[in-house]
Amino acid sequence: MSFASSPRLFWNFTSTFVASRTFPRHRIWLRNIAQPFSTAKTTPNLLSQMEKHAHPAQFPPVQSLSPRIPSMSPHFNEADRIEKYLHEDGHRAWGFVIYRCTYESDTAWEEFMRRILANTEETLEGSGGLDLLDNLAVTVFQDSSFDGATAAVVRDHFKRWAATAAQQEQGTGPGFSERYLYCIQVTQDVLDSVLADHDGFVRLVRGDWKEYDPYEEGERVEEEHEALEGCTLENVGWMQVPFDGVMVIPWYFLRGYGWEREYRRPPTVACF
C-alpha cells in the first residue's frame, strides 16, 4: 500500500500538509517555498494546523532529564542525548530539514517518507524515547526548482532559511542545534538506495561549509580527488550517511566537532 493511500495517514497535496495518524505525535508540513503559509490554498482548519506547526516553540516543553532505560548509561542512549542537547540549546523542536531533489515518481517519494517516519519511531522506541516524537519537527522543502539540484544549491537555500528559522521556531538563537547546521538531501540515487534496501543511504549537507584552498605555500597539502559536482577537495561539504536511524543517530554524533570526526568522502558511506 502506498504512503498516500494508507488509511493511517492523511496526505493533502493541495494544502501541502501531512498529519500523521500512524504517528499521532508527528505533525509534518510540506511547504512550497514560493508560497507563504498565509497564502496557501487550504481550508481554515488545515491552515490553522499548518500555522501551529510552523512555530515549534509552541510544542510541549521537553521533559526533565532522566535516564529512560536504567540499565543503560544516558551517554549511550540516543533519546537521552537528544533530550540533553535540547535542554542545552533551550529548544523544544528537533529534526533535520529534508530537501526533495527528485520528482520522477510521487509514489516513490511517498514511500520514502513513510519509511523515514517509521524508522524514526522505531529508532526512538529502542531507546525508550517515543516521548521525543512530541517535539519532532519534520520540514520538507519540495519544489520543482530543486529537481536535480546540487548540494551547493540546497546549501544556499538552507543557509537562508536557517538564518531566521531558530528565532521563529524556538524563540531563541540556534545554539549548537543540528537542525540549523545540517539538512538531508534526497536525490534520485538516494531514493533508489532506500527503496531497494532498508540499508540505503541519504545525503547529509553541511550548511556552513565553504570551499577552501588546498594549497599551502604553493604546495597542495591534500590529494586531488575525482570531481564531485565540480569539487575536487577532500571535504566536499556533504556526505552519504546510513538511512537507518538517520533522523536520530547523526543528530548526536555530529554535535560539536562531529563532522570532522565522522566525515567520509562520497561515495563512501559514513558509519556512525
Label for each model-derived stretch:
Residues 2-4:
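Fungal secretory targeting signals
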Residues 6-234:
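Extended, charge-biased low-complexity segments
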Residues 216-272:
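Acidic, proline/glycine-rich low-complexity IDRs
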